[in-house]
């Protein structure tokens, strides 16, 4: 591909190469550079890609794209932003695949995964569409699942995945759009037919300087959409929407909005409500419990309508949707009269939502097993300690991906937030032992909520991911204690 075509729409500061030259490939990892290819040097947080320009040259790089002035003798194109350049190079290299499909982008702290999976189900059921999905749990092309390591892939891989979706015949691509993805230009060059804002609560403050920065970063999505669905009940609603350039549909579970819920019923096996849109009133039933499911359902109904699906058809499709893995997921406990649920709740708001929802229908005691991740925003740890012990009858505070931090230090931060008058908690740092203990003390009608891991099947300790599937832990302990 000609260099000038790869660099279309990119702000160039300086170059010493012929724009008519042919480029064989693109890489931003110097180890993947091939003869005649392009190396994009990314100035990262931990590593500066410019340090690897000599290695790229040894491997045969024909041109280096960088935001810095390289050493003499290096064929280069200097650009204003290396991350933005990588994203747009990806768009150009793969033939702008996003323009061949309707793109849907969902942002927010909680609810992104459930909303994207439910919308995929609605589009498939109502339109018979082949739908691509990029998310926290997995990437999908139709029914084919592709493992994922981050919510939104790096920009070049993202464009490659969109190209796969296009080539496989997908008419729609639904994406979870994280604040990291927006800030790091991973979704640059994409324009969304529909966007969505679920909610905003404290998270990722290890990356963003404050909540205002976190909000403003996510709000950029609404300058890249034709239409969007926004949660009117969220406290960040006004700031989120103030600079939006797209048509907005508000949703609410508390009062009137463009689309809102009334007659809400929270049941042990799901939720029911009436969706109101203008003069229309449509019953909605979804077999996923929790008040947050009402918001996810409204979000999905709104996006479906913006994509041309009637409220009635979207609601009918939602009624056939199954639960989402790791989201209020019931774990089989044969022979036991207590219930075990797994949920991805790993933020203060997420933990409060799931525990409050379960508490609403729990006939026995609510036992919460939870922790906080290492190398992440420490501010939320005491907040989650207070929430967990305030709502649950019994809390078991434990580890959840300590990464490079000392697990006992993390746990001490969580315990620091517990009210002085509370004695309803235990600290068991080993997560497997914590789960075993919760099962040992569970009685008839009790519900155990294993919060934090959700769909994850690992525990990350000292930078190494060790296999840990809570479904297996529960099943194996039941088998062991049965014998």
PLM-predicted stretches and their roles:
Residues 1-14, 35-38, 84, 124, ...:
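ATP-dependent carboxylate-amine ligase
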Residues 7, 86-232, 236-247, 277, ...:
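Phosphate-binding loop of NTP-binding sites
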Residues 72-73, 140-145, 202-207, 376, ...:
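A short acidic, helix-capping loop that chelates divalent metal ions and anchors anionic groups
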């Amino acid at each position: 591909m000609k260099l000038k075509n790869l660099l279309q729409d990119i702000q160039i500061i300086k170059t010493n190469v012929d724009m008519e030259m042919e480029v064989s490939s693109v890489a931003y990892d110097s180890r993947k550079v091939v003869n005649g290819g392009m190396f994009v040097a990314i100035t990262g947080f931990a590593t500066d890609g410019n340090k690897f320009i000599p290695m790229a040259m040894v491997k045969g790089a024909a041109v280096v794209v960088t935001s810095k002035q390289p050493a003499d003798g290096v064929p280069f194109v200097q650009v204003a932003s290396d991350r933005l350049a990588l994203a747009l190079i990806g768009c150009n290299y793969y033939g702008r695949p996003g323009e061949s499909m309707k793109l849907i982008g969902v942002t927010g702290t909680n609810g992104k995964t459930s909303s994207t999976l439910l919308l995929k189900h609605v589009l498939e059921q109502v339109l018979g569409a082949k739908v691509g999905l990029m998310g926290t749990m997995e990437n999908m092309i139709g029914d084919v699942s592709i493992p994922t390591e981050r919510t939104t892939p790096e920009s070049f891989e993202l464009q490659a995945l969109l190209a796969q979706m296009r080539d496989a015949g997908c008419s729609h691509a639904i994406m979870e759009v994280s604040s990291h993805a927006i800030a790091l230009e991973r979704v640059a060059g994409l324009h969304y037919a529909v966007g969505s804002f679920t909610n905003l609560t404290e998270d990722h403050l290890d990356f963003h300087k404050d909540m205002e920065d976190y909000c403003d970063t996510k709000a950029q999505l609404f300058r890249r959409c034709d239409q969007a669905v926004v949660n009117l009940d969220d406290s960040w609603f006004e700031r989120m929407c103030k600079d939006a350039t797209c048509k907005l549909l508000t949703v609410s579970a508390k009062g009137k909005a463009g689309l809102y819920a009334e007659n809400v019923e929270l049941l042990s096996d799901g939720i029911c409500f009436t969706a109101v849109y203008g003069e229309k009133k449509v019953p909605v039933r979804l077999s996923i419990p929790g008040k947050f499911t009402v918001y996810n359902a409204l979000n999905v109904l709104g996006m479906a309508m913006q994509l041309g699906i009637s409220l009635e058809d979207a609601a009918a499709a939602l009624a056939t949707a199954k639960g989402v893995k790791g989201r209020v997921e019931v774990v089989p406990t044969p022979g036991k009269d207590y219930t075990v649920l797994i949920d991805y709740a790993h933020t203060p708001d997420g933990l409060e939502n799931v525990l409050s929802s379960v508490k609403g229908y729990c006939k026995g005691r609510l036992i919460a097993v939870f922790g906080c991740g290492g190398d992440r925003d420490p501010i939320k740890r005491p907040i989650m300690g207070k929430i967990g012990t305030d709502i649950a009858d019994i809390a078991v505070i434990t580890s959840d991906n300590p990464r490079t931090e000392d697990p006992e230090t993390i746990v001490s931060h969580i315990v620091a937030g517990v009210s002085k008058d509370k004695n309803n908690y235990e600290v068991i740092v080993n997560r497997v032992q914590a789960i075993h203990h919760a099962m040992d003390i569970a009685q008839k009608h009790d519900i155990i909520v294993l919060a934090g891991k959700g769909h994850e099947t690992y525990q990350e300790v000292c930078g190494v991911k060790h296999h840990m599937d809570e479904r297996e832990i529960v099943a194996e302990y039941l088998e062991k204690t049965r014998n």
